[in-house]
């Protein structure tokens, strides 16, 4: 009897652990330098946040509410800031900032929106706001 209980408990635990990654959210961070900051929140499932910061005094925040959203931020240099907010399902947002003193705010409210952009140089600013579904936006800025 005890043997059957142990086997049943072990089987239930393995099934539960096997089902977890299929609906789990994920976050990866890779920060170099010093005084870089990253934060985020995820509500739903299959959401992904990725942040790579190389330099100093960079900041990134990502917030996701829904399912299947992806937010990626790459920053190289110093004093760059990125904020990505995703509300809905299957939104994809990516920001690359190379240089210094850049700011990007990316907001996606809906389903299946795609936005990506790059800022190069010093002191660029971008504010992307997508409402509804199926929107696509891309930007490239070079600032002195």
What are these model-derived regions, one by one?
Residues 24-144:
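Low-complexity repeat regions of mature extracellularly deployed or surface/particle-associated proteins
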Residues 1-7:
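Positively charged n-region of N-terminal signal peptides that target proteins for export
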């Amino acid at each position: 009897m005890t043997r059957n209980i142990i086997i049943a408990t072990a089987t239930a635990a393995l099934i539960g652990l096997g089902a977890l990654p299929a609906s789990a959210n994920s976050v990866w961070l890779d920060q170099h330098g010093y005084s870089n900051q990253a934060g985020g929140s995820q509500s739903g499932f299959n959401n992904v946040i990725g942040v790579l910061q190389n330099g100093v005094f960079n900041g990134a925040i990502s917030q996701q509410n829904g399912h299947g959203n992806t937010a990626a931020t790459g920053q190289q240099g110093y004093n760059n800031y990125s904020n990505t907010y995703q509300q809905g399902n299957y939104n994809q947002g990516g920001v690359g900032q190379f240089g210094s003193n850049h700011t990007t705010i990316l907001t996606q409210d809906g389903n299946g929106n795609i936005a990506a952009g790059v800022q190069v140089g010093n002191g660029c600013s971008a504010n992307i706001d997508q409402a509804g579904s199926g929107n696509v936006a891309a930007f490239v800025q070079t600032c002195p």
